[in-house]
Amino acid sequence: MVKMIVGLGNPGSKYEKTKHNIGFMAIDNIVKNLDVTFTDDKNFKAQIGSTFINHEKVYFVKPTTFMNNSGIAVKALLTYYNIDITDLIVIYDDLDMEVSKLRLRSKGSAGGHNGIKSIIAHIGTQEFNRIKVGIGRPLKGMTVINHVMGQFNTEDNIAISLTLDRVVNAVKFYLQENDFEKTMQKFNG
């Protein structure tokens, strides 16, 4: 069996620490203590790293298509490596959840998230595992774009750091147990 963990974000140092790049941050934290080296794969339009965990190949992916076209990379990789949709997890930001809130789901709509809209459009289903990290709503008078492209303030940065630790633990638990339902029960809330 092969697993694929995808973190959504935008490529380039300009976006590195933005709220919208929480998926990239999560992937970086997950692989920190694993022997994973990323390569920039132009064919798949993604940075890809892999390792074996519990005798299963696991791909860690950061699409380089920019957020709104993430589905292009996800679909190409699922197809090429013959990865089942049930073995996919997508990690991304959610502005409808308070900062640092964590929510795991096995299906659902895009909820206005363009990266998720792209994935749904390309893979043809809303039924895939996802880990959502709350980034909160924009302050009064601030646009959604400025909010998601902004960085966390110091206080929120501390909370997000702790949440990213929980994301790492959730992914490790999932890879060990091979059961997303059980992972949701343990880490939601």
From Swiss-Prot:
Pfam families in the record: Pept_tRNA_hydro
Molecular-function GO term, any one: peptidyl-tRNA hydrolase activity
InterPro entries for this protein: Pept_tRNA_hydro, Pept_tRNA_hydro_CS, Pept_tRNA_hydro_sf
Gene3D superfamilies: Peptidyl-tRNA hydrolase (3.40.50.1470)
EC number: 3.1.1.29
Reactions performed catalytically: an N-acyl-L-alpha-aminoacyl-tRNA + H2O = an N-acyl-L-amino acid + a tRNA + H(+)
Site note Stabilizes the basic form of H active site to accept a proton, residues: D93
S-S bridge residues: none
A cellular component annotation (GO) from this entry: cytoplasm
Record site feature (Discriminates between blocked and unblocked aminoacyl-tRNA), residues: N10
Enzyme class, broadest EC rank: hydrolase
Subunit structure: Monomer.
Protein function: Hydrolyzes ribosome-free peptidyl-tRNAs (with 1 or more amino acids incorporated), which drop off the ribosome during protein synthesis, or as a result of ribosome stalling.
Protein name: Peptidyl-tRNA hydrolase
